[in-house]
């Protein structure tokens, strides 16, 4: 009787166990009552699914603790998302150790303190050795564990926005403590001081400390070698000129001001040291320019094997593409970034096939089988902006899926479920292929996310499919790219970086191998039987560098307030040697 009751109360667990699923999403109506009946914790049976890689429990006001057994029962967990619940005021140590965990999202809870992690002593292994993204935003944290850096030494993104922190632990900025940390967000806290040791964060690209209680910004911040974006708005700084600069100037200007010692360049020894540092940087820049901008035959040889990524700023673009985000998508799949890429050549040989294969590989690896993020590519000529990213009930969402007829999302999902069952019967195994593998990511959602163009047509239904309307073909040279995620904005940017750099590699490969172009009849009709004029193609020259143009796309709310722009100065920062990013 007891087992029957559990199966009836938690059918998702029975299904996940039967189908040997790697991902599980618990949300939607009825979840709160079941968790309350389980004592405010997750059911113990959940921790008997050792194959789980992704677990999300969100929007449950009765969930106060994960429950004992999580670490022991889910050793292969890669992503743990427990956002918008009622976790707190403390968090029991049973959350770790989790040796494979890469993403931990505890945002929107009621946490006031975190348990100390493992790794205090040199002989103790870190509790979260593979963790890359930690989201603690929207809690009530007053302090961070002193050993956070030792617990998660591979951390790349740390979001502490909207807490009650008045300081960072000194260990966080210890030399070599977090060598990979590229994003630190701690806006809307009570921070009073920023340690000069922040300069030890060698990989830091973006820093958001807006709306705190800082009175000074350490000059050492300018020594962060990769820092591209900073936000100190809403702090009452003693240096009023600097306070005015952080409200309106670009990051480069602010760092330059800090680098020379503030107003007047400082005095005495400080000024001399600042001048020496600046002179050293100037010489390095000149050496780099000489290497990159040589003349004569040496430059010609270098150009032939180089590919330029030209970033077109929104202000330079007469018709920039914009994505508006409606509020209801926040509870479904809140994060999206977009970009426009011009200058691809998919006509030669297997170029299109390689392009589509690269997307599949990204979905499998970096996107963690679409659980962390989902990317979509569109024929730009068929995209009519501005675009709207929203969420709709399944019965109201209509799309023409790739290779299928128009259908409502509810009907499409049902059809895919039937096809999945048929696959299992034919192959006599539980695993399925294609789009059928991602259906469980919609479990429990009352609304489905979608991207809608200016004509009102749905061109994307993440994480399931794109629309036939914007299908990429061999004739496609200009593309609109989108990446969405239910996990974090940073993973969207990471996937977009990887996709664009992969496109650059493919462009270089196509040019070097000089494959012959080919068009199918259908594709030839699409361009009226005419191939593009090589003289108008910026990459057609044999002697100069090939060019891809990446246009910035702004994501705004319905009032027009900016949410994110891609690519920003901090994006595309890890380009390979043969790719030069021109901003």
Swiss-Prot record:
Residue positions where Phosphoserine is found in the record: 315, 431, 518, 520
Modified residues (N-acetylalanine): 2
Coiled coil: 402-437
Biological processes per GO annotation: phenylalanyl-tRNA aminoacylation
Biased composition (Basic and acidic residues): 270-281
Stretches for region Disordered: 260-300, 513-544
Keywords: Acetylation, Coiled coil, Leucine-rich repeat, Phosphoprotein, Repeat
Taxonomic superkingdom: Eukaryota
One Pfam family in the UniProt entry: LRR_4
Name used for this protein in its record: Leucine-rich repeat-containing protein 47
One example GO MF annotation: RNA binding
Stated consequence of mutating residue 193 to D: In a colorectal cancer sample; somatic mutation
